């Protein structure tokens, strides 16, 4: 209501300029009409247009695979285009941050993806009871044998095959869904065992670990903060990747890049071009604001961002807009507008312009 009634101030766009750009020439995949498109670097570029106007063809089918091949000398063939030029040396890596699951196994979760679980396992293995019993960090892993429940292999549930229906997941009777052997669950840090910790929300975990004097605990709290920054304070540390929505998986990937240690790459700075496809899907106004602030943090590190998006708040926050259309299908595939959000307002040919007014 605060947003709808205008009582809460929306995100205020930062003004950014750029000195470098790349140019995609002769894009002709699907309905694209042999177009030349310039993408500025070091800023937020938003690609807009009605559904079917050619946005995904331009960014996902041509630009991303073409850049990936240029940088890595391998990869799938891009869609039809004539050339890629400009400040290509200003990009060391290209990342397509999609909504696919964060791990191949259902045991994958946010803390394993962000590598925070290594510190949690170390913290527990350093406790007196663990040392007395010879428990190492590997005993607190649910990916290998040792401390995990042998019945469910660290899943917390078992799948029951149904002959004529989809398999049914049942809580493991052996561990009661706690994933680990009883002796491992006896190890406690400040009264909490591994199951208790994995059932904390991100917000609860930051409060718990951040209040401790132990430097490892404080590091855990710090490394969890990016999940809050992308609007995921509510998810459980041990929540299976199979239960996360596509949008949540995408934001965990964003949190991973926000958590990357800059000091490790000072000798050879990383300049990553991030590509997002409709990252605001399912987000509340407040979460969109957090997403934009996360984009700001990536840009402040010297990276570049291209977003395919319909959300008006994201479009208004752009430094550069590329509007495709004017219609969908055969009537689309042209660059209707390329410029700043303020200049877009004067473009009568753009449906996006009319939508934002």
Which ranges hold each PLM region?
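Conserved phosphate-binding elements of NTP-dependent enzyme cores
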Residues: 1-357
């Amino acid at each position: 209501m605060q947003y709808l009634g205008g009582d809460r101030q929306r995100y205020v766009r930062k003004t950014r300029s750029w000195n470098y750009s790349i140019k995609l020439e002769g894009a002709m995949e699907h309905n694209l009409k042999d177009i030349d498109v310039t993408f500025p670097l070091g800023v937020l570029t938003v690609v807009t247009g009605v559904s079917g106007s050619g946005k995904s063809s331009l960014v996902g089918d041509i630009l991303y695979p073409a850049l990936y091949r240029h940088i890595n000398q391998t990869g799938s063939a891009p869609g039809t285009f004539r050339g890629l030029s400009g400040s290509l040396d200003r990009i060391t890596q290209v990342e397509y941050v999609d909504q696919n699951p964060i791990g191949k196994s259902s045991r994958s979760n946010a803390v394993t993806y962000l590598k925070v679980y290594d510190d949690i396992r170390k913290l527990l293995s350093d406790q007196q009871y663990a040392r007395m019993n010879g428990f190492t960090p590997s005993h607190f892993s649910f990916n290998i044998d040792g401390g995990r429940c042998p019945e469910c292999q660290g899943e917390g549930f078992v799948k029951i095959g149904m002959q004529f229906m989809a398999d049914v997941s049942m809580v493991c009777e052996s561990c009661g869904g706690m994933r680990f052997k009883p002796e491992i669950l006896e190890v406690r840090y400040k009264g909490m065992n591994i199951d208790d910790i994995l059932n904390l929300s991100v917000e609860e975990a930051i409060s718990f670990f951040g209040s401790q004097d132990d430097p490892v605990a404080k590091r855990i709290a710090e490394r969890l903060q990016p999940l809050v920054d992308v609007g995921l304070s509510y998810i459980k540390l041990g929540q299976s990747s199979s239960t996360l929505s596509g949008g949540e998986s995408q934001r965990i990937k964003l949190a991973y890049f926000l958590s990357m240690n800059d000091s490790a790459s000072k000798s050879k700075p990383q300049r990553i071009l991030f590509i997002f496809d409709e990252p605001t899907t399912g987000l509340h106004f407040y979460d969109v604001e957090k997403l934009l602030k996360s984009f700001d943090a990536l840009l402040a590190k010297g990276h570049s961002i291209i977003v395919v998006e319909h959300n008006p708040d994201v479009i208004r926050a752009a430094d550069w807009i590329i509007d495709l259309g004017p219609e969908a299908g055969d009537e689309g595939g042209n660059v209707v507008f390329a410029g700043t959000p303020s200049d877009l307002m004067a473009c009568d040919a753009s449906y996006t312009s009319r939508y934002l007014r």
